[in-house]
Design a protein with these regions (language model features):
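Catalytic active-site module of serine/aspartate enzymes centered on a nucleophile-bearing elbow/loop
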Residues: 2-4, 252-281
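Short, surface-exposed "cap/lid" segments of acyl-processing enzymes
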Residues: 25-86
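Short alpha-helix in the alpha/beta-hydrolase fold that links the catalytic acid
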Residues: 64, 219, 233-242, 253
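Catalytic nucleophile-loop/oxyanion-hole region of alpha/beta-hydrolase
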Residues: 85-112, 117
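Gly/Ala-rich beta-loop-alpha elbow adjacent to hydrolase catalytic centers
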Residues: 120-124, 128
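Active-site nucleophile loop of the alpha/beta-hydrolase fold
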Residues: 142-153
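Short beta-strand/loop motif that positions the catalytic acidic residue
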Residues: 217, 223-225, 229
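Acidic catalytic loop of the alpha/beta-hydrolase fold
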Residues: 228-232, 260
Length: 281
């Protein structure tokens, strides 16, 4: 517990430092939106490490975290580096920075609870699968709307913008770099309104790195997807499901027309499915 307290205080310090360094008036959200947090459940037998998605913040998964806490689980929600601050911060981060954030979160929850289930939303789902493939002690994994195949305009645009920036660099131009595209999020009180193109490339790198590891993943797994997700292709999460090496795996398709299915109407059904999965394993 002392280890957990120390690591949590370090994570909070790092966030406060990043927040003040990258704060942009009128663009950064209130500091509490990005704060990592621990939900103390009744039991310390099973803990959950729960990760937010890209361009979001821990607040995005708070409803699920509170629900899991209410049915008895300890839950730790880390902040992914570059998030909860400003898009300019995120533009400078690699997916390895996000992996490091998740690994520190795992160190925290595993120092509190005997068994740990890891899970996440969107890019956080990819990070949870990556952790479960690397760390054999993980008890199970759930992945909601994992971004194996992106269909959002800005991700299709990313390679072209990347190429444009390289051409501009080669020309030694001080001309305009196209570093961000506009983001119109479902939850503007949480998510960034500018999407750094470099960040989209990092999601693709993360998922490319993850794919060959999936056949080695042999813990119970739950893959959750929205049927008409406007951001990630459902066939991408089905591909993840098929590639998973574990025999104990479930694929749940929910009839939503949005990406963020952990918030808003009907999200309680998704929370319940995740709770049932954790209880079962």
């Amino acid at each position: 517990k002392k280890v957990a307290d120390y690591l949590i205080s370090k994570a909070v310090e790092e966030y406060e430092s990043d927040y003040h360094r990258y704060y942009i008036q009128g663009e950064s959200k209130p500091i509490d939106v990005g704060m990592p947090f621990l939900v103390k459940g009744k039991s310390k037998n099973v803990g959950v490490l729960l990760s937010q998605g890209y361009m979001a913040a821990p607040r995005e998964v708070e409803n699920l975290a509170r629900y899991l806490g209410s049915i008895g689980f300890c839950v730790y929600v880390p902040r992914l580096k570059g998030h909860g601050t400003s898009p300019d911060d995120l533009a400078n981060r690699s997916y390895q920075d996000w992996v490091a954030s998740i690994d520190r979160g795992y160190a925290i929850i595993s120092s509190i609870c005997k068994r740990v289930v890891v899970g996440g939303f969107s890019t956080g789902a990819g990070l949870a699968l990556d952790l479960a493939a690397r760390v054999k002690e993980v008890a199970g994994v759930f992945a909601v709307a994992a971004p194996m195949t992106l269909k959002d305009f800005s991700s299709k645009f990313a390679p072209a913008v990347d190429m444009w920036n390289r051409i501009m660099d080669k020309a030694y131009s001080v001309g305009p770099k196209m570093e961000f595209v506009e983001n119109k999020p479902e939850n503007p009180h949480i998510n960034y309104l500018r999407n750094p193109i470099s960040g989209v490339r990092e999601i693709e790198r993360l998922m490319d790195d993850l794919e060959p590891k999936l056949p080695d993943l042999d813990v119970p797994a739950l893959i959750v997807q929205s049927r008409r997700d406007p951001v990630v292709e459902p066939k991408g999460s089905l591909k993840i499901f098929k590639l998973l090496g574990t025999e104990d795996k479930e694929y749940r398709l929910f009839n939503f027309d949005r990406h963020g299915i952990l918030l808003g109407d009907g999200s309680q059904r998704v929370h319940k499915a995740i709770g049932e999965f954790i209880n079962r394993i």
